[in-house]
C-alpha cells in the first residue's frame, strides 16, 4: 500500500466496468484516483462515492478523450487537485458505436491515447508510468482473425499500441515507463455482451478455446498490479 499512498492516477473510462473496478482497487492501496467519464456523471460520481466511503480519495472529471481541450483539462485538474500526476491508465476504448464517423475508432483508440500520453508526460515526474489496456484480439490482429464487427476496434487499438511504443524513447528521456496489459474477451463487459448478441455462443467458444476468460474484476486486478510491477518498459 505504501508504494501508492499519495500518488495520483488518472484512469480513462473508469465510470464503469474494468476501469471502475481498477479505480477502486488502486484507491484501496492509497492512491488518489481521477475517475474519467465521457457523459454519465451520475455513474462516475457513484464510483467516487464508493471510494470515499471506503476511506479513499477520488474525483470525477468529464472528458471526451477525442477532444484535446478536454484532455488538457483532465490532466490539469488532476495536478491542481492532488498536486501531482504519477500514473496514467489508458483504459477508455470503443469503436463499435454507430453515428460517430468512419474514423471514430482510430481517433479514439490511436490518436486520443497518444495525445493524452503526451499531455500527461509533460506533468509526470521521473519514475512515472503509463499503462495501456488492450485486448488479445487487438494485440494479435496481424496474426489472428477476429469478428468483422470488432475489426475496426482491434485494428485501431493495435495502431494505438504501436503509436505508444514508438513514443517510448521520448518517454524514457523523461524517466517515464510504458506497460501494455492485454487480455482475451472479458466476461461481463459491454463489448463482450454485444459480440455475443451478434454471434450467439461467441463467449462460450472463446472460453473453450482459451480455457478461461477473465471476469471484469479479475482483469482489473491484473491492470492494478502492472501500475507498480517491476517490468521493463514496453
Give residue ranges: language-model regions.
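Conserved glycine-rich Rossmann-like NAD(P)H-binding loop of the short-chain dehydrogenase/reductase
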Residues: 29-46
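Catalytic Tyr-X3-Lys loop
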Residues: 99-121, 127, 131
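Catalytic loop of short-chain dehydrogenase/reductase
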Residues: 93-99, 129-173, 185-189
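Rossmann-fold scaffold of SDR-type NAD(P)-dependent oxidoreductases
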Residues: 12, 85-93, 109, 132
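Conserved glycine-rich cofactor-binding loop
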Residues: 8, 15-17
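Hydrophobic positions on the long internal alpha-helix
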Residues: 74, 89, 112, 116-120, ...
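C-terminal helical subdomain
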Residues: 174-182, 196-234
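The beta1-alpha1 cofactor-binding region of Rossmann-like NAD(H)/NADP(H)-dependent oxidoreductases
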Residues: 41-42, 62-74, 110
